[in-house]
């Protein structure tokens, strides 16, 4: 049975669990609940690992316990040991707005230390879900990504993480096709650009449940 790997990046320890840098872990935790599988620690790979069958594939879900900057130390040996056909990495991205999602295969790490670590071990030949967290005007990058999502962002997270879950499922169901077809499909149907709230929406503190039903998400194909 062909094997796939979905890896979410983050830092272990409870103090990091709600931080922007841990969005990869958050998506995998949501998948665990929705798809009814459990994570268990695998000492061989220094990672939390879960697995289920989706269609013709065995799909592994992995949360490295190495800390972000050493993510490749867990992912690379896992990919080699199980002869993984395709790897899909979910990570935070400060270069796109909060909640925006983009997909790519290969290419630059964009300065993300978790991706740098993976690339140093196995190159850049893997799929990526770039989950936008935006930037801060007041905090440096490290302080910002290691801080918790704010209250307004937390209201939106559940719907956004659910969208990311659907993208993961689509990847798993299409994994038998050439990587170019998989990437085009993800970019066309799951790329997300969140309309920014107007000042009145922000002042009125509208719930995301209401906003979600009204928003017209803009999907676009990356060049």
UniProtKB/Swiss-Prot annotation:
It catalyses: an N-acyl-L-alpha-aminoacyl-tRNA + H2O = an N-acyl-L-amino acid + a tRNA + H(+). Monomer. The record marks 92 as: Stabilizes the basic form of H active site to accept a proton. HAMAP family: Pept_tRNA_hydro_bact (MF_00083). Belongs to the PTH family. It holds the Pfam family Pept_tRNA_hydro. Its EC number is 3.1.1.29. It is an enzyme of class 3 (hydrolase). InterPro entries: Pept_tRNA_hydro (IPR001328), Pept_tRNA_hydro_CS (IPR018171), Pept_tRNA_hydro_sf (IPR036416). This is Peptidyl-tRNA hydrolase. The active site is at 21 (proton acceptor). It comes from Helicobacter hepaticus (strain ATCC 51449 / 3B1). The keyword Zinc does not apply. Disulfide bonds: none annotated. PROSITE patterns: PEPT_TRNA_HYDROL_1, PEPT_TRNA_HYDROL_2. GO terms for biological process: protein quality control for misfolded or incompletely synthesized proteins; rescue of stalled ribosome. Keywords: Cytoplasm, Hydrolase, RNA-binding, tRNA-binding. GO terms for cellular component: cytoplasm.
């Amino acid at each position: 049975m062909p094997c796939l790997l979905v890896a979410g990046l983050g830092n272990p320890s409870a103090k990091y669990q709600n931080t922007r840098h841990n969005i990869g872990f958050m998506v995998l935790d949501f998948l665990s609940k929705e798809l009814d599988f459990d994570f268990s620690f695998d000492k061989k790979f220094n990672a939390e690992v879960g697995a289920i069958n989706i269609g013709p594939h065995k799909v592994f879900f992995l949360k490295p316990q190495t800390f972000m900057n050493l993510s490749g130390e867990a992912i690379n040996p896992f990919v080699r040991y199980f002869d993984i056909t395709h790897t899909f990495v979910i990570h935070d991205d400060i270069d796109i707005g909060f909640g925006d999602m983009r997909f790519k295969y290969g290419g630059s790490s964009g300065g993300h230390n978790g991706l740098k670590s993976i690339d140093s071990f196995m190159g850049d030949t893997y799929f990526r879900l770039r989950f936008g967290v935006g930037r801060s005007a007041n905090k440096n990058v490290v302080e910002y990504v290691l801080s918790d999502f704010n209250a307004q962002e937390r209201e939106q997270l559940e719907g956004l993480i659910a969208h990311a879950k659907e993208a993961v499922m689509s990847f798993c169901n299409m994994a038998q096709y050439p990587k170019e077809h998989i990437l085009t499909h993800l970019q066309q149907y799951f790329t997300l650009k969140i309309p920014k709230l107007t000042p009145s929406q922000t002042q009125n503190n509208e719930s995301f449940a209401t906003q979600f039903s009204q928003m017209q998400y803009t999907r676009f194909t990356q060049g």
